[in-house]
């Protein structure tokens, strides 16, 4: 029986049918690696969706940055509206890992800010993987980082049935063991409240509904689901499966074993420091670890508990840590891993382990952490690439590694379903690039189309943005410090024509699906380096390939070897596409793609939550936030997004009571 229900108004076209057939056949023949070489705009995402539907396996789709993850999530939600499409990226808005600089005797404490909505989506992904097979997870490099043992997670989850006998007090203790906190005042995700014989539980993986369990003595009398906003009953259930509030939740037995294991390791390490006559490190480690042990014994958690992950998961020293792959492969289930934009993603995955290990080794050496902290790490590249699953690498410009691993299992996708050609390109003198580009932008904007500009430095991007804004252009600048939510919003705003020109550095290359963009400008194209390599140039030029008027301007004083190779590949592909169009009498037409609903990662709520935590908020600041939210609330209501409008209304009311 098919797991996935793929919805699309169009059948595969162009090179898609042969690519889908070839790669599906390769996967069904149990080949470990395969590669899709697909030009920009050829519908690689749709090909991926068809392959998932035909291979009938849960899938993990990995990308190297959060912007692409958000875009893929949106597209796959549209392709598979009746299946479980999940989102798994880092849950930190801000993260400063703990570190020690010996030469300055400076210890830097871990400092982080967790995004509540991203945490909810991560929990939703792991719970879906443990409960269902029709799951597609869109993930960043976070998929390679350590998680709790999925089998322990299964032990902690609880099935609750109407009519079953349960001691009321032991049920509350079970909720605490599962990571839920009792809170009678602020009832939100990951908490529960108990009034009389009624227990309300707000699952950590769902922000829309909470569960009410009603007892009669020591018997469960009723289970109901309530709307979290309106507080009205939605439905009654005969039973419900309740998952833990944390991916690191463990049972009391495992917790006790972990405490004993940490104590044993501490004793060995203290003995080592004593023998080496390193009393400073001895006392430092003893004090820090014993405090952590007290906290774990009393509450089940401590600050930096991830550093003791090996003790909680039961892994041996240096053994591969549990991660998202283990949730996909639970019950020896077969699954598919698709690495999107593999030419960038794979090198990024390969560099994760070394940096993490370098920092933690210093912490261990100087007594800030036990050696087991080294096992709280991302996967090594060899561990990742040899996972017991099948891989599909997807890129317009795959590296040698992907092609060597895939051998003959490589499919090309050069012909676009729309008949669109690779863009025309032109090299212009960089001496007058700013003024020349300004004139080009005016003609593009007059046609109602958009422009992407890529620069080499942040300073140039800022100055260019300022210059063009002063000259009357609607322009925005996207830089690396902008978070995932805001990046997604900026791209959406560009498509909605809230502005016409987007300037960036290395943010405009892979995977940005912007059919409204007809002009891509590459400043200082002849400056050899990573940002102007053959691969980077081809990827950047491809941003103009979704529009029938697509054009690329490269500003340079000379034609470099990288530029020449990029021109040759682009010209080869364009010639092949033109020939196909001529044979089949196809006229290129710009892609028309509806604006899917963006990720509802409520940045407004996060901002207000932080503001509400402050003891004193100036009246002027409060009024400013209220005004901002009122505007957004009206916009949401106008767009018929009444649920979000009501959320904003409630936040405004809360602010006005301060």
From Swiss-Prot:
InterPro entries documented for this protein: Helicase/UvrB_N (IPR006935), Helicase_ATP-bd (IPR014001), Helicase_C-like (IPR001650), P-loop_NTPase (IPR027417), UVR_dom (IPR001943), UVR_dom_sf (IPR036876), UvrB (IPR004807), UvrB_inter (IPR041471)
Keywords assigned: ATP-binding, Cytoplasm, DNA damage, DNA excision, DNA repair, Excision nuclease, Nucleotide-binding, SOS response
Cellular component, GO annotation: cytoplasm; excinuclease repair complex
Chief place where the protein resides: cytoplasm
Record's comment describing the protein's domains: The beta-hairpin motif is involved in DNA binding.
Keyword Lipid biosynthesis: no
UniProt xrefs under PROSITE patterns: HELICASE_ATP_BIND_1, HELICASE_CTER, UVR
Protein name stated in the entry: UvrABC system protein B
Annotated compartments: Cytoplasm
UniProt xrefs under CDD domains: DEXHc_UvrB (cd17916), SF2_C_UvrB (cd18790)
């Amino acid at each position: 029986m098919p797991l996935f229900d793929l919805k699309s108004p169009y059948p595969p076209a162009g090179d898609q049918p042969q690519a889908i057939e070839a790669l599906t056949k390769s996967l069904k023949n149990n080949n470990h690696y395969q590669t899709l070489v697909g030009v920009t705009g050829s519908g690689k995402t749709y090909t991926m969706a068809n392959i998932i539907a035909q291979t009938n396996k849960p899938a993990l789709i990995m990308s190297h940055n959060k912007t692409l993850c958000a875009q893929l999530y949106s597209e796959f939600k549209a392709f598979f509206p009746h299946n479980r499409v999940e989102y798994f990226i880092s849950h930190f808005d801000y993260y400063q890992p703990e570190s020690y600089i010996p030469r300055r005797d400076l210890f830097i404490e871990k400092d982080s800010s967790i995004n509540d909505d991203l945490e909810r989506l991560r929990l939703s992904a792991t719970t879906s993987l443990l409960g269902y097979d029709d799951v597609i997870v869109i993930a960043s490099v976070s998929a390679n980082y350590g998680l709790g043992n999925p089998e322990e997670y299964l032990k902690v989850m609880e099935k609750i049935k109407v009519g079953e006998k349960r001691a009321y007090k032991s049920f509350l203790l079970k909720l605490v063991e599962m990571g839920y906190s009792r809170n009678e005042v602020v009832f939100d995700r990951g908490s529960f409240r108990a009034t009389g014989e009624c227990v309300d539980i707000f699952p950590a993986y769902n922000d829309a509904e909470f569960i009410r369990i009603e007892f009669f003595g020591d018997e469960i009398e009723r289970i109901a689901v309530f709307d979290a906003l309106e507080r009205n009953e939605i439905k009654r259930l005969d039973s419900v499966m309740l998952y833990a509030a944390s991916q690191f939740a463990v049972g009391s037995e495992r917790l006790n074993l972990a405490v004993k294991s940490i104590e044993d390791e501490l004793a060995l390490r203290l003995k080592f420091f004593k023998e080496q006559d390193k009393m400073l490190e001895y006392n430092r480690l003893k004090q820090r670890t014993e405090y952590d042990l007290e906290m774990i014994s009393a509450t089940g958690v401590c600050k930096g508990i991830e550093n003791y992950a090996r003790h909680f998961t039961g892994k041996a020293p240096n053994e591969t840590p549990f991660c998202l792959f283990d949730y996909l492969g639970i019950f020896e289930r077969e699954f598919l891993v698709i690495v999107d934009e593999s030419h960038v993603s794979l090198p990024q995955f390969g560099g994760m382990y070394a940096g993490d290990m370098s920092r933690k080794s210093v912490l261990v050496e100087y007594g800030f952490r036990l050696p087991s902290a080294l096992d709280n790490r991302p996967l090594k590249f060899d561990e990742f690439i040899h996972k017991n699953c099948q891989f599909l690498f997807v890129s317009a410009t795959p590296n040698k590694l992907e092609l060597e691993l895939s051998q003959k299992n490589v499919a090309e996708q050069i012909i676009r379903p729309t008949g669109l050609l690779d863009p025309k390109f032109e090299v212009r003198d960089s001496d007058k690039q700013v003024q020349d580009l300004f004139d080009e932008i005016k003609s593009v904007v007059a046609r109602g189309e958009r422009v992407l500009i890529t620069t080499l430095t942040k300073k140039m991007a800022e100055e260019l943005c300022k210059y063009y804004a002063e000259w009357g252009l609607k322009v925005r600048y996207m830089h690396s410090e902008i978070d995932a939510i805001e990046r997604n919003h900026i791209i959406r705003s560009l498509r909605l024509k809230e502005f016409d020109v987007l300037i960036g550095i290395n943010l405009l290359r892979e995977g940005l699906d912007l059919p409204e963009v007809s002009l891509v400008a590459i400043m200082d194209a002849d400056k050899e380096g990573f940002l102007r390599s053959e691969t980077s140039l081809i990827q950047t030029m491809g941003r103009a390939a979704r529009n029938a008027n697509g054009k690329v301007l490269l500003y340079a004083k000379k034609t470099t070897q990288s530029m020449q190779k990029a021109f040759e590949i682009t010209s080869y592909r364009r010639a092949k596409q033109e020939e196909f169009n001529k044979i089949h009498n196809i006229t290129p037409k710009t892609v028309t793609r509806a604006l899917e609903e963006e990720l509802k990662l409520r940045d407004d709520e996060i901002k207000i939550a932080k503001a509400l935590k402050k003891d004193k908020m100036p009246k002027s600041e409060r009024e400013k936030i209220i005004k901002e939210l009122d505007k957004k609330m009206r916009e949401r209501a106008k767009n018929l997004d009444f649920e979000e409008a009501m959320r904003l209304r409630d936040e405004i009311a809360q602010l006005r009571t301060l």
